[in-house]
């Protein structure tokens, strides 16, 4: 006999036997065209594409294969900078430079990690209905951006990098997230893609993507792979089996708030205390000084991966005083040892959940820039009884590489047909029953996509409504878990308690996003939600508005570029004429004095106008160039007709125009 669960108006009651239905959604053959793979990181992002049978990790306009996840607004016009340009001006414009959006995305403002981070950030984070919102100055105005909008700007940059390389528009992407990201964080990342004008065809877990990068060419039977992914802001561990192109995740664990930035912060706090002790001055009072220190500490940390000590030197750090201190590898390790050791607990948990022993692990794959830290490598090696981690993949690029391969699989690229990806959900999902008990429907580490159903009933006679409260987490009581959302099923016909049959179905899709349905089996009355977690999610109206804002920013960026190009053209043309008039071998030796004077005056006038019209629009700049050409061209043409230029062509538009460095 099937046991029925009793649903109260607020809570649900009883536990025990349930009917379970599990189905795997079939792969649909869809032709998307090119799908890029994006590793959207806390501190750096990376983009790749699978074409002609191989993955290409794409360099940005600075020639770098990883791009800082930074957005800044600078100058009187509030020009938007993204990537290297934004990070490079952090120390002179800290309040208007946004980074770490990944540490805010999908979280509540009151989240204790958000509150801890706010103390370290130079930009303002405001509370908007318990959602964090970043406030910066854009030109003369204060403007607020959600973490989704900031992440969207970084995604736009990655999209542009790919488009520049491919020479065509890109509309589809596979985007990676930490394996331990919850439902709200995954949804928010998908929303960021939508705002950026990208169709996110799949969200995949970062360690799984790295395993694809590592295991693509491994054809030697079944192997157990542990992926240890320690990046700039997040930490994941996943255990996978790889067997002839089939990648199956057995278990995953981690900390969505642990990474290289936390190591930097420890060193910064040490230096701030040291500086105060020596000089009596508090560096924290000067945001620029703190950001200068942050930049140099990050450099020092990188240096200590290959050196045993390094100097941290900053000219005029605070009140005109220079800063110079030595940082040894031993001190760096001492300051961070508890954080390094904390990475081993999730490793142990993943082994237990996979039902594997240390000796069963064939390969340890290190991913994320922070795995370059020698002490981290040493601790992992010791944990696995001296087993050396594999060094076959670039820790900065592996995740984007795997995402690009998955993009190739989905778009039907050649040579990807044998790759099958079986991922898991990181957290248990269930509903609240009477007494605040967490009744589990889908256990953690269940292979996704998956679908499970369970039958419940009413807790009171003639009860017309039941409320389904959905939670994720591992604790037995819902108060200790994370609420994803709730909804009502109404219109239940009058009946004694325990008689109505209400079937609740949980379905997790390929992106790890949950859809919940409740159906009254007697009437066929249904209600369903995709878990949106109203506290954390953006409404469709919000997303629409943000897409429009993003398009407006793209338009503004285009105007800034047009203005710069128009200024450059006028400047180049004017100075080219000035040089030619001053050169007796060129125009200077061929013009009579009156014509020479006319051109000189016109050129000086244009240069003077440029100096006093810094904010001139592209149209005004083009008009000035036209005026200058109107005065110069008749004289040069006359000279050319007379043969006085000695075969030399007139300095027409663009004759000396080059992009200036």
From Swiss-Prot:
Any one of the GO CC terms: nucleus
PTM field: AMPylated by fic-1.
Region of interest called Disordered, as start-end residue ranges on this chain: 618-661
Bias type Basic and acidic residues, positions: 619-630
Stored InterPro entries: ATPase_NBD, BIP_NBD, Heat_shock_70_CS, HSP70_C_sf, HSP70_peptide-bd_sf, Hsp_70_fam
UniProt keyword annotation of Repeat present: no
Composition bias, Acidic residues: 649-661
GO BP, sorted A to Z: chaperone cofactor-dependent protein refolding; endoplasmic reticulum unfolded protein response; ERAD pathway; IRE1-mediated unfolded protein response; protein refolding
Leader sequence residues: 1-17
Ranges in a coiled coil: none
Entry keywords, A to Z: ATP-binding, Endoplasmic reticulum, Nucleotide-binding, Signal, Stress response
Compartmental location: Endoplasmic reticulum lumen
Prevents secretion from ER, short sequence motif: residues: 658-661
Reported function: Probably plays a role in facilitating the assembly of multimeric protein complexes inside the ER.
Protein known as: Heat shock 70 kDa protein C
Organism encoding this protein: Caenorhabditis briggsae
Protein encoded by which gene: hsp-3
